[in-house]
Amino acid sequence: MAIIILVTPEDKVPWAMGLYQASMVMGLVFGPLMGGLAADLLGYRAPFIMFSALTGLCMLGIYLFMPNLQFEHKVDARESQLSLIKSFLVIPRVRLLVGLLFLCNFGITGIGPILPLYIKHYMHMNDEFVATIVGIIIFGAGLFSALASISIGKITERLTMPCIVFTATWAVGTLFILQYIMPSIWGLGIFRAIAGFFMGFITPIANTLISKAVPIERRGIVFGAVSSVAMMGNVLGPVLSGMIARAFGYGAVFWSTAAIFFVAALFIYRSLVIPSES
């Protein structure tokens, strides 16, 4: 991500972050799909060979086509990594946006483990079709998320980034509630896809705002830490969602996630939207 920020002109950063996020989401969507097809057609060892070859091609492409990039602005070699991380965590805007990235990944992955069980227990679906329906729902959410990420460049020309990220965060919270109250599987799937669309705005814009809030020479270490926090959201999302579902029921996962997004939206409004309008 730091390389993308380095080679992209400042006015094109939102577009670049959107394209990066779209490619990540589509990889997460199509990876299991292609792996499953390869396993069914060629055997369970085939996906390992196929993705090893793909990784090798990526490495070869980087070696052959990636230019030797050098940061013009370098940090003092005497500064430790910990001190560099602390230097950006003291910035309130950066803390808020990093927390938002964690929350977004938490919301995306947290619902995944309980979704098949929720559909099976509350929507009385045949066990034979639950896995297929969940796959379709996840694919739809990922596809709409990628479409939103790609369109960020044009949308930021009309609306401010704080306004977009506030609207998207509030909309995601509302859509989690709508997913819970839907009586049919198709209603759940539609609102899950719309929630994926709004989630597609959050990560690229948050990354863009972070890049604008820190000095150029510190963007590399900042985005390294940001990636770590985002991955923690991927890890803790399923764990905490499972604990909530066990203690309070499957519906509590939807309500708790929605509540967290609403709280995040209020912080965004106070810390980003109001200062940008004044």
Residue positions per predicted region:
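Juxtamembrane intracellular "pre-TM" segments in multi-pass secondary transporters
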Residues: N68-V98
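C-terminal membrane-cytosol helix-exit motif in multi-pass small-molecule transporters
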Residues: L54-E72, F267-L272
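Intracellular juxtamembrane helix-capping segments at the cytosolic ends
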Residues: M1-T8, F201-V214
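Pair of pore-lining "gating" transmembrane helices in MFS-fold secondary transporters
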Residues: I91-G110, A193
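Short amphipathic helix-loop junctions that connect adjacent transmembrane helices
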Residues: I114-A131
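Helix-to-loop junctions at the C-terminal end of transmembrane segments
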Residues: A148-T160
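Structural signature of the two symmetry-related core transmembrane helices
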Residues: S52, C163-I177
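Cytoplasmic helix-loop-helix junction between adjacent transmembrane helices
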Residues: M1-M24
